[in-house]
Amino acid sequence: MITLGIETSCDETSVSILEDSNKILSNIVSSQVEIHKTFGGVVPEVASRIHVEVLNRLMDLALKEADKDFKDIDLISVTYGPGLIGALWVGITAAKALSLALKKPLVGVNHLEGHIFANFLRDDPPSFPFIALIVSGGHTEYILVEDVGKYRILGQTLDDAAGEAFDKVARILGLNYPGGPEIDRISKTGKSIFSFPKIRCDRELDISFSGIKTAVLYLVRDLKKENKEIPVADIAASFQERVVEELLERAMIALEKFNIKTLVVSGGVASNSYLQKRFKEESQKKGIKLYIPPPYLCTDNGAMIACAGYHLYQKGYKSDLSLEAKPDLLLGER
């Protein structure tokens, strides 16, 4: 079965051709990072316009690289939320047009579902049930995944997503956008010598990054007042360690609470080198089977959407031409 996956939820345009459940024939991604860097963040109207400009070309490139034609496509899969509403509509409109013209089935995919299924693009995918941690620029959630389409949110961020916190702290430290890779890079030259507050929430699997972010802000402000040098690498390393340890602690609590031995981590922040190191160390120590996609599948991409769409379709899920963009779509909502 050949699935065409389309991802346009934020600032990456991506089209992928997938054979059966996990064979990536092509996965073309056009990133807008350099464009939005000048604004210090994603500008929704600009993102939508660029999706319109590049999507058709990416489809042609994806088909060419896969050595396929439109007539070879069996299923069309597209992100329909959550995300930027204008950006989502670009992908949905293209997917519906293809479905109508080719007379092929259409499946709308939750973007977060796509991140989970990025871990299924391998020969030994995780077995249900498992705990999933999605850590990205827009989301931080702990999820009990019981089956395809069956999700239970156990905990989530009460304010900024992890990736958003990285971006904001990077800005405080004078680093470039996007902040996640910058903090990861510069932390390698620093030492975790600053103690930032532990996160406390009413629910044990919820998380909040506002306290850590504020602590960084006050630390930098006080150092400037005293005309002291800002040890950017050390602050970055200390911040990164605190965030990762908090994420890890809650993941282990969730696994123990539900007596599950499989942990799936995905989203852009999952490519952070310190996060990967600590999660691997702790998983090995506790006999947990850990899944983290390769970096190119951690960030937004069409392959994960194609994969999720394939599995949903096999379970009987499908959409029709009334499919609409849902910028605030919740995981498990249809």
Curated annotation (Swiss-Prot):
User: Looking at the UniProt record for this protein, which Gene Ontology cellular component terms does it annotate, in alphabetical order?
Assistant: cytoplasm
Highest taxon of the lineage? Bacteria
Question: Pfam families of this UniProt entry?
Answer: TsaD (PF00814)
**GO MF terms on file?**
iron ion binding; N(6)-L-threonylcarbamoyladenine synthase activity
- Per the UniProt entry, what are the Gene Ontology biological process annotations, in alphabetical order? tRNA threonylcarbamoyladenosine modification
Q: Which residues bind substrate?
A: 134-138, 167, 180, 184, 272
Task: Tell me where the signal peptide lies.
Answer: none
Subcellular location field: Cytoplasm
What job does the chain carry out? Answer: Required for the formation of a threonylcarbamoyl group on adenosine at position 37 (t(6)A37) in tRNAs that read codons beginning with adenine. Is involved in the transfer of the threonylcarbamoyl moiety of threonylcarbamoyl-AMP (TC-AMP) to the N6 group of A37, together with TsaE and TsaB. TsaD likely plays a direct catalytic role in this reaction.
Q: What is this protein called?
A: tRNA N6-adenosine threonylcarbamoyltransferase
What organism does the UniProt record list as the source? Answer: Dictyoglomus thermophilum (strain ATCC 35947 / DSM 3960 / H-6-12)
Species classification: Bacteria, Pseudomonadati, Dictyoglomota, Dictyoglomia, Dictyoglomales
